[in-house]
Amino acid sequence: MNALREHWQALWTAVGYFTRIPVPASVGFSQAGLNRAARYFPLIGWLVGAVAAAVYWLVLRTVPAQGVAVAVSMGATLLLTGAFHEDGLADCADGFGGGYTPEDRLRIMHDSRIGAFGAIAVCMALLLKWQLLSAMAPHSIGILVAMVAAHAASRAAAVSHLLTHDYVRAEGKAKPVAQRMRWSDALWAGVFGVVPLLWFGPMCAALIVVGLILARWLLGRYFVRRIGGITGDCLGMAQQIFELLILWGLLAWMSS
């Protein structure tokens, strides 16, 4: 019973940390609880993707404009998550684009103000996502599943960096979840991330996973070269990049 309670609290911890959804006061907050919650991060992707799909479907029932429905669904996910991962993308873009040493990059990334590189990166990411999803609109069911799959699998791939990379900044919101991830937690996160992809067939899911493994390896090497490891912002940037790659791959698969 205690083990079940711990998992339940870990799930609620993940919900409270990565969304704006209020969680029961009894959940509390602890470093150990947040680390245990890592395996459930892809399930937050299920939740965010399901909200996006529901909003898209509802808007499309009222306005026959697929681009508008996609835009509103994206806005709903930004409200739900507080643009948590987009903020990480912006911070990384500013730091990597404007810093000349690892120390400079970390200092810029820690600055809450957004710069030109960050603004451009977020705008490009949102535009690409809007265009990719809009292109999926003819696939009425496929686009709904793609929303869930992209949010889930991208979070699984991003959090897997905690399995192999060291955290390089002592302060910051994501520090408590920056301990090395256990293999058992990584396995569960991987399962939660891959399951929605299987709707498109095992071959498609396998190709997406192979692409994510390659992209994760390249991005991890980039982080190490630029700042010597990872930060919470790096995980946000990784999630955004992986989400775009997944949508790109799914669109190519559905269009073939």
From Swiss-Prot:
This protein's species is: Ralstonia pickettii (strain 12J)
Q: Does the keyword NAD apply?
A: no
- This protein's major location comes to membrane
- The encoding gene is cobS
Known Pfam families for this protein?
Answer: CobS
Q: Please list every transmembrane segment annotated in the UniProt record, as residue ranges.
A: 40-60, 64-84, 114-134, 143-163, 194-214, 234-254
CC annotations in GO: plasma membrane
Tell me the keywords, alphabetical order.
Cell inner membrane, Cell membrane, Cobalamin biosynthesis, Magnesium, Membrane, Transferase, Transmembrane, Transmembrane helix
Q: Lineage of the source organism?
A: Bacteria, Pseudomonadati, Pseudomonadota, Betaproteobacteria, Burkholderiales
Q: Which domain of life is it from?
A: Bacteria
Name the record gives this protein: Adenosylcobinamide-GDP ribazoletransferase
Membrane topology qualifier? Multi-pass membrane protein
Q: Which GO terms describe its molecular function?
A: adenosylcobinamide-GDP ribazoletransferase activity; cobalamin 5'-phosphate synthase activity
What does the record list as coiled-coil region(s)? none
Location within or outside the cell: Cell inner membrane
**Pathway listed:** Cofactor biosynthesis; adenosylcobalamin biosynthesis; adenosylcobalamin from cob(II)yrinate a,c-diamide: step 7/7
Cofactor(s) for this UniProt protein: Mg(2+)
EC identifiers of the protein: 2.7.8.26
What catalytic activity does the UniProt entry give for this protein?
alpha-ribazole + adenosylcob(III)inamide-GDP = adenosylcob(III)alamin + GMP + H(+); alpha-ribazole 5'-phosphate + adenosylcob(III)inamide-GDP = adenosylcob(III)alamin 5'-phosphate + GMP + H(+)
Class in the EC hierarchy, top level: transferase
